[in-house]
Amino acid sequence: MQSRKLYKSLYFQVIVAIICGVLLGHFMPDSGTAMKPLGDGFIKLVKMMITPIIFCTVVVGIAGMEDMKKVGRVGGKALLYFEVVTTLALIIGLVVVNVLKPGAGMNVDPATLDTGAIAKYTAKAGEQSVVDFVLHIIPNSVVGAFAEGEILQVLLFSVLFGFALSMMGQSGKPVVKLVEDISHALFAAIGFIMKLAPIGAFGAMAFTIGKYGVSSLSSLAALMGSFYLTCLLFIGLVLGTITRFCGFSIWKLVRYIKEELLIVLGTSSSESALPRLMAKLEQLGCQKSVVGLVVPTGYSFNLDGTSIYLTMAAIFIAQACGIELTLTQELTIIGVLLLTSKGAAGVTGSGFITLAATLATVPDIPVAGLALILGIDRFMSEARALTNLVGNTVATVVVAKWENALDSDKLAAELHNPTPLAHGLKVEAPHLTREVSRTLS
């Protein structure tokens, strides 16, 4: 009975799919690369649902608030937390890369590097300033924001719409109820889509190994090893300390979201687990309004794994090219990254684009050095995405506790003995509850 239950669990299925993808990509590279549409298709299916779910969650959460000032407080606390923690991520990346020096001794001449492959990234890096990013949050069309999957634009519209419904009083209640019912249906649909997660993870992993090969990692293994180690240190030390002060264990939280982490590992996209993550955070005891505001905002402003990557990659390039940087120059890089990492948020390939934008503003490090890490960037994206997911999970729980919007007893109970995900969806229709339970558990 236990083996049957394990066999049917999403956790087990995704692990098996990832292993099969690695084996296919390694032994049959051509067949592995042909599996790319499976991974792309799954990610597109999930992204199709993200903006409607964010809209429903935020609207219902805000419209149900009695104190409208709470929205501003939650947003302000979230942004403050994001800035502090991403700064710590940048600093810990700086410390580790200076201690381990993965690029030392490579003695690369920037003039010999092929910059053709990075041209599209450096071009995009110059296209969007911080001002452009802020203006981009305001959509030209609400329909366009939903159609193009612009999370921050949808979040802005959702906040305004939720405020409006709240101000309407009783006359706005039917609309709120309709949006809440739509939310239940959307989560049920996500349950159906998540049945395909093993297929998506298999396709994405088979493509990655088939195209780049395991052997391609050896030349830059030092940087990759240093980066993965730093991500673990950040989760264990920085996020672990934060969660300890808040009264719970980071490792119990990681275990609680293990299915979401495996989906992210297989697809290299932290967005692929966003709908399930939002449902689980509500189940964990966080109020819907806090989840709806913090999680979507965090996906643009609280990218801890990306922050670690940016610092380490920039200093690695300098080390590889034999460039000695002073402490002032390294701190300047961190200051620039605090700005540029926000300016490129939400852009496809944002990590590489942000790095290009940063190097363009720091004359001491050649932009051509990006060509050094282009080949292994795909292999480091898994650690970036996993760390981003854990970071945003912690951020939501911490902000909820800070705002007294967290049921601590429920948090402790769920971390000790997690219940099926459907319980966190608060689905009122009995037939829908059964359907969601079958598809999400």
Curated annotation (Swiss-Prot):
Membrane protein topology class: Multi-pass membrane protein
Xref: Pfam families: SDF
Molecular function GO terms recorded: fumarate transmembrane transporter activity; malate:proton symporter activity; succinate transmembrane transporter activity
Keyword Transmembrane helix: yes
GO cellular component, one term: plasma membrane
Spans through the membrane: 9-29, 45-65, 79-99, 145-165, 187-207, 220-240, 308-328, 356-376
Domain of life: Bacteria
Keyword Transmembrane: yes
Main location: membrane
Coiled coil: none
GO biological-process terms attached to the record: L-aspartate transmembrane transport
Keywords: Cell inner membrane, Cell membrane, Membrane, Symport, Transmembrane, Transmembrane helix, Transport
Location(s) in or outside the cell: Cell inner membrane
Function, in words: Responsible for the transport of dicarboxylates such as succinate, fumarate, and malate from the periplasm across the membrane.
Family: Belongs to the dicarboxylate/amino acid:cation symporter (DAACS) (TC 2.A.23) family.
Official protein name in the record: C4-dicarboxylate transport protein
